[in-house]
């Protein structure tokens, strides 16, 4: 009987682990879930001032790059995938609303806390090594995502188009 209970317990742990790893990606349920693309020619405001306010070195590109933000839910967690295809960057940030997550970006550690403000997704990003904070707001209006970036008093915006089939 004891062996049966141990086997049953182990099966349950294995089944739960497999189930959580195989949870389907949910692309709907919140306005900001989905895939959003900004081409180089798409609209932006105040981008160079934002890059300067961050204190990035001059070799950092001031020009706009094709940028893709994808947000989905899988199990109990959300994922924010940031892609810059021209720079071969593809960063998957797994998060839970209201909880801080720490990631590495290049040589820097970033602390990010995502939360909702009405229908908007907000991310407060801290860069301890630089003593800087970025306040990002993801606001979906129709088939567009308007992302606002704020450092100190400098606010920049970038417009993204929603992709009809985010899994593609």
Swiss-Prot record:
Region (SAHS-c2) location: 72-100
First and last residue of the signal peptide: 1-19
InterPro entries xref list: Calycin, Fatty_acid-bd
Inducing factors: Expression is highly induced during desiccation.
Alphabetical keyword list: Secreted, Signal, Stress response
Annotated region described as SAHS-c1, given as residue ranges: 26-57
Gene3D superfamilies tied to this protein: 2.40.128.20
Molecular-function annotations in GO: lipid binding
Region (SAHS-c3): 113-162
Annotated knockout phenotype: Affects slightly survival under dry conditions but does not affect survival under frozen conditions.
GO cellular component: extracellular region
Domain notes: SAHS-c1, SAHS-c2 and SAHS-c3 are 3 highly conserved regions within the SAHS protein family.
Note: Trehalose, a disaccharide essential for several organisms to survive drying, is detected at low levels or not at all in some tardigrade species, indicating that tardigrades possess potentially novel mechanisms for surviving desiccation involving tardigrade-specific intrinsically disordered proteins (TDPs).
Described function: Secreted heat soluble protein acting as a molecular shield in water-deficient condition. Tardigrade-specific intrinsically disordered proteins (TDPs) are essential for desiccation tolerance by forming non-crystalline amorphous solids upon desiccation, and this vitrified state mirrors their protective capabilities.
Name of the molecule in the record: Secretory-abundant heat soluble protein 33020
Lineage of the species this protein comes from: Eukaryota, Metazoa, Ecdysozoa, Tardigrada, Eutardigrada
